[in-house]
C-alpha cells in the first residue's frame, strides 16, 4: 500500500475519525456497491462471524454502511483467503446477515452483474466523469 505512511501519520491525529474505503463498484456514472475487502488464511464460520461482528459494531463497518447509504447502494463484505481461491460475500444489512460462498468465476459473474439501483439513477444529478 503506497499510502501506508500517510495513513499511519493521519490515524495519529486527534481529530474526529478517518477510514479508507476499499472499493466502490461503478457502472458508468453510477455507483452500485461499497465493498469491504478482507483476508484470512482460512475461512470458516468462526472467521465469518468474527468479521461480520467487527464490521457491524465497530467504527469501520458503521462508517462504510454510512457511505453506502449516502450513495444509495448496498454494502458488501468480501472475505477471501490470501490466494483469492476461497471467496465469501456478506450483504450486511443486520448483525445476523448471512454469507454466500462463491468460486472465483461465480464471484466475477455476480460482481459484474451488479447494476445501479433505480433510486441511485433517479437522484444522481452529479456527473462523475470529466467531459474532456
Which residue ranges define each predicted feature?
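Domain-level recognition of nuclease-like catalytic cores that cleave nucleotide substrates
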Residues: 81-131
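Short His-Asn-centered micro-motif
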Residues: 35-38, 57, 78-80
Amino acid at each position: 500500500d503506497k499510502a501506508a505512511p500517510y495513513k499511519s501519520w493521519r490515524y495519529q491525529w486527534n481529530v474526529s475519525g478517518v477510514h479508507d474505503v476499499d472499493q466502490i463498484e461503478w457502472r458508468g456514472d453510477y455507483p452500485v456497491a461499497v465493498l469491504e475487502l478482507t483476508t484470512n488464511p482460512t475461512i470458516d464460520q468462526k472467521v465469518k462471524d468474527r468479521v461480520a461482528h467487527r464490521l457491524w459494531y465497530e467504527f469501520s463497518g458503521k462508517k462504510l454502511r454510512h457511505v453506502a447509504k449516502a450513495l444509495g447502494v448496498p454494502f458488501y463484505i468480501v472475505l477471501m483467503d490470501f490466494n483469492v481461491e476461497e471467496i465469501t460475500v456478506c450483504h450486511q444489512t443486520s448483525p445476523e446477515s448471512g454469507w454466500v460462498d462463491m468460486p472465483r468465476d461465480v464471484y466475477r459473474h455476480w460482481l459484474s452483474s451488479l447494476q445501479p439501483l433505480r433510486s441511485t439513477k433517479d437522484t444522481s444529478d452529479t456527473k462523475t466523469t470529466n467531459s474532456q
